[in-house]
Amino acid sequence: MRFAAATALLGVAGLAGTAPAQTPPAAPAITRTVVAGTKLPSLGDTPLYFRVVSVSISPGQKISLSAPNGILYQLSGSTEVSAGEAKTITGGGGALIAGGTTASLTAGNGEHSALLYFLLAPKEALDQPVAAAPETVKELYRTTAPLPELKPGSYELNLTRVTFPPGMPSNPPHHRSGAALYYIVSGIGANTVDGKTADRGPGSLIYEPFGLVHQWGNPGSEPLTFLAFNINPEGVPAVVPETPAKP
C-alpha cells in the first residue's frame, strides 16, 4: 500500500512538473486616434510654416476664426463650430478648418471653452490675426524657418492623439517623412535626440522637421498622451524607421 501511495504521489508530481507555464499578459498597446485630417491636393512651391495658438472663449461668447488650413482641438469645455456645417466638439475632439474658410465658434453649455488651433501657414499669413477678437487668441509656437523637404505634390494633414502606456521603453530611432509638431497633453515623455534624452511634460511643444532622427518613451508610472500635428506625402508613411539619406 505504501508503495502504491508513493507511486501515486510521484505521478501527481510528474503531472505538476509537466504543466504548461502560464503566458505572461501582453504589454499595454500604444493607442492612436485621428482627431481630424484632410488631403491637400497640391502644396505648390510656397514655403510653409507650423503655428499653434490657444483660443479662449468665455461662456456664451461667439468669435470668428479665419486662417490657412488648420485643426482645432478641444482641451476643456465644449464649442459649437460652424464652418460650412455645424458641429459641437467636446474635450478631446477636434474640427478641421479649411484654408479660406471663416468659422464661427461659440462656447457651449454655459462653460468656458479652451482650445488649441494648429495651423499650416505661408509666411505672409503668420502675423495676420486669427480671430476677429484677438484678445481670445495667444500664440504658443511658430517655426522659425519653413518646413524643409516639402515638395510640390499631394499631402496628408492630420492631428492625431497618441497614448504611450506607463513604463514603455523608447521606441527605435525614426524620423518624419514630412514634419510634425507635438503637444504634450498629460504625463511626461522621454525624448531622445543625438543621444541626449530630455523630459517633456504637459504643455510642451516639440517640433520634428524632416530628417530629425529621434526616439520617444514613457519611463513614468502614468500614461503619456500627446498630440501630433503632422504633414506627410500622400501614400508615404508619416514615420520612417531609418536614418534619412544625406543629400
Protein language model regions, located:
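Residue-level "contact hotspot" at macromolecular interaction interfaces
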Residues: 56, 73, 88-89, 96, ...
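A short beta-loop-beta micro-motif enriched in histidine and acidic residues
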Residues: 47-48, 58-73, 154-155, 167-183
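Short, conserved secondary-structure segments in the cores of folded domains
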Residues: 53, 70, 85-86, 160, ...
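Bacterial N-terminal signal peptides
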Residues: 4-14
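Glycine- and acidic-residue-biased ligand/ion/polar-headgroup-sensing regions
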Residues: 67-85, 177-194
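A short, N-terminal "cap"/entry segment at the start of jelly-roll beta-barrel domains
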Residues: 20-54, 62, 87-99, 104, ...
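Short acidic-glycine-tyrosine-enriched beta hairpin
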Residues: 84-102, 194-212
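Short beta-strand His + acidic residue motifs that chelate non-heme Fe in jelly-roll/DSBH
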Residues: 63-65, 81-82, 102-110, 172, ...
